[in-house]
């Protein structure tokens, strides 16, 4: 299908590594002179930080110990779907920013833990780029996945995902190990029901697998490095993918299934550049013909 206003969505749980993938896309956009409009998934949370704490306390008092940022109740799924639909049809839409810390507060002019006002996406963009929790979400009321032309899943094995979240939340956000563990436990039902199913909707999944012991992520002192990892890359539709070329260009890579290639963790950026650049250029070419 020819789309005049293509959409790319990057989906992953908290601590999955979607921000690193976003940086690779930004490098490709810069090199290929692609102008992207950006949406951050946090912008479509329903509550700011103080409101979420209040709602969590209220739900806890009612006996609900699993009220989390992953669920439809705490996110603006209909509004997110609306922006995807609007951009796909007209190249326009509204978004905002969720301000996490003092540095972002200085940039956007609102206190940490709050949202900026809604504002229009930039004019004259080549495509829309979403990065967050729900870029391919499908429920009985919304279907965000249907509007994205290229859907990427970032899905480390679960223990590695937890290690990354623990380290990020402790070091960058000042939380204790106990607090992060409580968050992981509280989110688990919504993780199973609303995060995992998205990775059956994605076109490509990047799954990092550590080659060191991560049996107890809650006591791990270090995040396994790329040199201590392999990455499984699964393509939903491998038609048109030149696997022999990829195998020749990525040292020590191999195919584990007809639609899956395994690479050394240190070669992830190279693999993403080789796989994603042609797909992005295809979207731009179709845009020009639409």
Swiss-Prot record:
Gene name, Swiss-Prot/TrEMBL: cbbP
Recorded metabolic or biological pathway in which this protein acts: Carbohydrate biosynthesis; Calvin cycle
Enzyme class: transferase
Homology family: Belongs to the phosphoribulokinase family.
GO MF annotations in UniProt: ATP binding; phosphoribulokinase activity
Domain of life from the UniProt record: Bacteria
Binding annotation for ATP: 12-20
GO biological process: reductive pentose-phosphate cycle
Catalytic activities: D-ribulose 5-phosphate + ATP = D-ribulose 1,5-bisphosphate + ADP + H(+)
Keyword field contains Ribonucleoprotein: no
Keywords: ATP-binding, Calvin cycle, Kinase, Nucleotide-binding, Photosynthesis, Transferase
Keyword rRNA-binding: no
Enzyme Commission no: 2.7.1.19
Protein name, as recorded: Phosphoribulokinase
InterPro entries linked: P-loop_NTPase, PRK, PRK/URK
């Amino acid at each position: 299908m020819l789309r005049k206003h293509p959409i790319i969505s990057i989906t992953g749980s908290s601590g999955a590594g979607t921000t690193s993938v976003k940086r690779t896309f930004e490098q490709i956009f810069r090199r290929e002179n692609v102008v992207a409009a950006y949406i951050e998934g946090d912008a479509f949370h329903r509550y700011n930080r103080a409101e979420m704490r209040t709602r969590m306390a209220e739900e806890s008092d009612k006996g609900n110990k699993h009220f989390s940022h992953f669920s439809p109740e705490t996110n603006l799924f209909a509004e997110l779907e609306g922006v995807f639909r609007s951009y796909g049809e007209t190249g326009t839409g509204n978004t905002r920013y969720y301000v996490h810390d003092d540095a972002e507060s200085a940039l956007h002019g609102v206190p940490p833990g709050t949202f900026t006002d809604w504002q229009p996406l930039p004019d004259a963009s080549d495509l829309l780029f979403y990065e967050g929790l729900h870029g391919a979400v499908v429920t009985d009321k919304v279907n965000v996945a249907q509007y994205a032309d290229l859907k990427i899943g970032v899905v480390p094995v679960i223990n590695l995902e937890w290690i990354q979240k623990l380290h990020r939340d402790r070091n960058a956000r000042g939380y204790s190990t106990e607090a992060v563990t409580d968050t992981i436990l509280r989110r688990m039902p919504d993780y199973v029901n609303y995060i995992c199913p998205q990775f059956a909707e994605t076109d490509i999944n990047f799954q990092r697998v550590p080659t060191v012991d991560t049996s107890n992520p809650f006591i791990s002192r270090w995040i396994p490095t790329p040199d201590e990892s392999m990455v499984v890359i699964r393509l939903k539709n491998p038609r048109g993918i030149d696997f022999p070329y990829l195998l020749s260009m990525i040292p020590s890579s191999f195919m584990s299934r007809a639609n899956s290639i395994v690479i050394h963790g240190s070669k992830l950026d190279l693999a993403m550049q080789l796989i994603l650049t042609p797909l992005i250029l295809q979207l731009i070419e179709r845009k020009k013909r639409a």
